[in-house]
């Protein structure tokens, strides 16, 4: 379960995906499959959430990892590299960015 906390000793990653309404459902299915079958089982994975906008042109992913290195190792794995090629084919752009939580209200 996601817990947003400034005192948490974890790495936060927010990834935004741009897509079309025609590919949004397929992209969401690929992302859910990746989290269910692979990402959530990787060392250091804490939690994640997927969000889609009303127009179905953007998907936002919020994930937490024990350490930055855990997230990077998952990205570099052969399975995730293959999955990311499929994800890239369904999105016009996606960008993972690492963040630090500085306030919770």
Which ranges hold each PLM region?
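Short beta-strand-to-loop capping motifs
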Residues: 16-21, 63-65
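Short, surface-exposed ligand-recognition loops at beta-strand->loop->(often short) alpha-helix junctions
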Residues: 18-31
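Residue-level signal for secondary-structure boundary sites
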Residues: 23-25, 69-71, 104
